[in-house]
């Protein structure tokens, strides 16, 4: 993979440029003409500067209103991204990440920011060229703004807009990959020279006479109109990102050129924003801030004076010792910070606010200051938390407080890995991978109930399909990557959504794509063995220790049979697992021929796997017919697909939980182990498997890691699966029919004495309060939404659920 980057830069504006809370409008509020014809507005750019290379540009449009209208709806987009100001007020940023055939625009009513008389729309637009993030598509630097009707056409982008390139910005931290010695594709940080910045450029009284007239490129176009398929303007599918002010928990360490320096300690009220911190001229100061928890946020540094100073901000998930080990994340002794960094050069002005247009990820943030001939005043330092606005609508309470810690930490992990798309991790990649997303989507639906980001992800992957029929493994991504098993997980995601949401039209549209994915695999089945033969690309399954990184092929996590001549039992059963779900979908949507085809295919795949890979002496499924490698993964999918006879499945799961001779699953694949435990009646053992999560908490992690130490990423939402399983396994709430129209609730208490909580359902809230009575008894109540019924099961006894039901076994 080649290192392309998306840079993050800092927009500087006066204190009046604070962030406003605003909601994007939905597609049904858009003028229908704009959905079905070319826009009057033109894409615009700078007339002479390079529009392909790194650059930051400011655009302005002055206009006059005789009176303030009740509504003033505009639609805005940019390449790469924009931040919009109206009369000096920061209004919104975007567009949401998509691809060239789905270039999203934002629809907003800006009437609340307008005034009678002179008004100005101002937008900063940036393009990071070759340094852009891998998740960012681009054509060239451009902006488009379209009024919703004739009343708003006055602000349409055309040659009347003005533009200037901002010379204050240069990319920084281009060596982050080498510094951290790992894969990073979120782009460079920013070197900002405040003396070159056009202060107050976003305000109405700014003089833009020296700015250039914008150059027009082409009219905005929508899908199906004309022949163009780039910058296809598409209404935003997700809400605005949440933004909330947050402050640092502590200053953990300071050092200065002179240990006795009086300024070395932060003033008592500084972290609360109540006192300034003055750094004298010609001094050096290093300050280590601790957020207390990992966060994704826009740091906001407010300073005055300090001309000739230099400020570095270094961001890290954790500190490391001399050997590169993270150890306990709370400990800082004999540890240093390594991470990407921003650089600021103050101009001596007052009230200068430095804020990135894209967020940073950190728990620890180190500020390094070197002042020049003028003292530097730190007026304030805080941050603006930003993530997808998932609400924690579910509640899960028990008599074991450590489960509350796992719940809270898992939810933080899920939140930091959800933005304009789901992220695998917020620090290193910010890419949406199918294997991660399946778990993240279930967490979102069970804990929040918000399905918009889930729907967006399902569409993203369907839109990623390339000519061979497979979906890409991650999307949006300007660097294409193919992991064939992830195309299968996309099918599983569609099936998950079908069981949890009553949206048949949305689901049915994916069936042709499912057929394409499965046809790709069918063509690669070995007719001699019935197993999957050689399958191209990266057949990732899990980051198991035995499945090492292959530097020649540049792949890892691949089981035996996944990267040579095929015959992998795991990959074959993953195919069978997806085919079984495809058969159910085709049955439901009245495609009997296709459904029967998939049922027979699933039968053939499982029979071939058992015939070729079952080792009678070991009583395990081998990873290949050679029977010289055995993994927990193969047994898990042997159970999930019924490749292993049903009467042997429970015994199998009991064995693999303790047999360390097998290749072991990481945090990611333990999600599938849990599903196998549920299937075999061993859900009561689930809480016994949470040791790795408790170990992470003991190591001071505030989010769950990519894998157990040593790990690259401290925040990976595929490891937040307990937030789903506390509700789906411990509380035992699962759909009993498509669309979640009926439920099945079979709690698995393990060693708990009571569980209490609630879970969002499309029709309302499922509420439960249950307590064990002695060894076998259970009492309490379950409340379902009005139009939902279900079955409650306890130790082979059952009762119908309807409205409020008293439980007494």
Regions found by a protein language model. Give the residues of each.
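Non-catalytic C-terminal accessory modules of carbohydrate-active enzymes
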Residues: 175-200, 265, 600, 607, ...
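Extracellular/oxidizing-compartment recognition motifs
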Residues: 21-427, 436, 452-453, 457, ...
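Aromatic- and histidine-enriched alpha-helix N-cap/loop-to-helix transition segments
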Residues: 79, 360, 428-436, 449, ...
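C-terminal capping/lid segments that line or modulate ligand- or cofactor-binding pockets
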Residues: 186-188, 192, 429, 447, ...
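Alpha-helical support elements that line or immediately flank enzyme active sites
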Residues: 298-317, 365-368, 434-464, 494-501, ...
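Bacterial Sec-dependent N-terminal signal peptides
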Residues: 1-23
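Active-site acid/base region of carbohydrate-active enzymes
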Residues: 156-166, 172, 364, 372-409, ...
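Heptad-repeat amphipathic alpha-helical coiled-coil interaction surface used
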Residues: 491, 498, 576, 582-583, ...
């Amino acid at each position: 993979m080649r290192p392309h980057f998306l840079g993050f830069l800092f927009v500087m504006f006066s204190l009046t440029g604070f962030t406003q809370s605003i909601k994007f409008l939905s597609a049904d509020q858009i003028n229908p003409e704009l959905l079905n014809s070319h826009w009057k507005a033109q894409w615009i750019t700078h007339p002479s500067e390079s529009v392909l290379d790194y650059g930051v540009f400011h655009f302005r449009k002055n206009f006059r209103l005789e009176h303030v209208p009740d509504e003033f709806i505009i639609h805005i987009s940019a390449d790469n991204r924009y931040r919009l100001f109206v009369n000096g007020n920061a209004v919104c940023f975007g567009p949401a990440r998509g691809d060239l055939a789905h270039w999203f625009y934002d629809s907003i009513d800006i009437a609340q920011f307008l005034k009678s008389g002179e008004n100005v729309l101002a937008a900063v637009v940036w393009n990071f060229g070759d340094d852009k993030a891998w998740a960012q598509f681009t054509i060239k630097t451009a902006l488009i703004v379209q009024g919703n009707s004739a009343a708003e056409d006055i602000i349409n982008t055309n040659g009347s807009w003005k533009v200037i390139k901002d010379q204050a910005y240069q990319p920084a931290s281009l060596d982050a990959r080498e510094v951290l010695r790992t894969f990073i594709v979120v782009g460079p940080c920013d070197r900002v020279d405040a003396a070159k910045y056009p202060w107050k450029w976003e305000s109405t009284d700014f003089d833009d006479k020296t700015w250039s007239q914008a150059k027009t490129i082409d009219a905005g176009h929508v899908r199906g109109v004309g022949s163009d398929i780039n910058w296809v303007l598409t209404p935003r599918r997700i809400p605005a990102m949440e933004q909330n002010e947050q402050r640092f928990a502590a200053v953990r360490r300071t050092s200065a050129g002179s240990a006795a320096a009086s300024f070395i300690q932060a003033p008592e009220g500084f972290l609360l924003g109540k006192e300034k911190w003055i750094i004298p001229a010609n001094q050096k100061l290093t300050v280590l801030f601790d957020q207390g928890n990992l966060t994704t946020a826009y740091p906001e540094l407010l300073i005055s004076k300090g001309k000739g100073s230099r400020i570095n901000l270094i961001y890290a998930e954790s500190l490391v010792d001399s050997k590169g080990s993270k150890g306990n994340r709370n400990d800082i002794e004999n540890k240093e910070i390594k991470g990407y960094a921003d650089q600021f050069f103050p101009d001596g002005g007052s009230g200068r606010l430095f804020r990135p247009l894209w967020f940073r990820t950190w728990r620890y943030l180190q500020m390094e200051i070197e002042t020049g001939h003028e003292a530097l005043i730190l007026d304030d330092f805080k941050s603006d938390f930003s993530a997808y606005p998932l609400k924690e609508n579910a509640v899960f309470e028990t008599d074991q407080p450590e489960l509350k810690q796992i719940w809270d930490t898992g939810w933080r992990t899920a939140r930091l890995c959800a933005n304009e798309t789901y992220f695998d991790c917020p620090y290193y990649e910010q890419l949406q991978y199918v294997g991660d997303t399946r778990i993240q989507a279930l967490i979102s639906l069970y804990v929040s109930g918000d399905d918009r980001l889930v729907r967006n992800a399902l569409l993203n992957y369907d839109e990623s399909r390339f000519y061979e029929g497979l979906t890409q493994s991650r999307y949006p991504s300007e660097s294409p990557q193919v992991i064939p098993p992830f195309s299968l997980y996309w099918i599983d995601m569609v099936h998950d959504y079908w069981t949890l949401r009553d949206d048949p039209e949305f689901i049915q549209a994916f069936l042709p794509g499912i057929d394409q994915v499965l046809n790709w695999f069918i063509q690669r089945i070995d007719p001699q063995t019935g197993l999957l033969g050689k399958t191209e690309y990266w057949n990732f399954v899990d980051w198991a220790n035995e499945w090492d990184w292959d530097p020649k092929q540049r792949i890892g996590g691949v089981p035996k049979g996944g990267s040579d001549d095929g015959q992998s039992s795991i990959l074959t059963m993953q195919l069978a697992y997806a085919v079984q779900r495809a058969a159910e979908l085709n049955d439901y949507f009245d495609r009997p021929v296709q459904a029967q085809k998939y049922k027979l295919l699933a039968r053939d795949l499982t029979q071939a796997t058992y015939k070729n890979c079952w080792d009678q002496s070991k009583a395990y499924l081998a990873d290949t017919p050679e029977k010289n490698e055995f993994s927990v993964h193969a047994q898990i999918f042997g159970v999930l697909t019924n490749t292993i006879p049903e009467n042997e499945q429970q015994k199998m799961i009991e064995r693999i939980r303790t047999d360390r001779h097998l290749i072991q699953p990481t945090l990611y694949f333990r999600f599938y182990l849990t599903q196998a435990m549920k299937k075999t009646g061993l859900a009561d053992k689930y809480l016994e498997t949470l040791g790795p999560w408790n170990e992470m908490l003991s190591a001071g992690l505030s989010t769950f890691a990519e894998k157990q130490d040593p790990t690259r990423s401290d925040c990976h939402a595929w490891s937040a699966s307990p937030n789903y399983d506390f509700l789906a396994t411990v509380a035992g709430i699962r759909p009993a029919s498509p669309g979640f129209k009926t439920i099945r609730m079979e709690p698995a208490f393990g060693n708990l004495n009571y569980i209490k909580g609630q879970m969002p359902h499309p029709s309302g809230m499922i509420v439960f309060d249950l307590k064990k009575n002695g060894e076998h008894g259970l009492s309490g109540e379950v409340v379902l939404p009005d139009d939902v019924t279900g079955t409650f099961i306890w130790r082979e006894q059952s009762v119908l659920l309807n409205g409020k039901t008293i439980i007494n076994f």
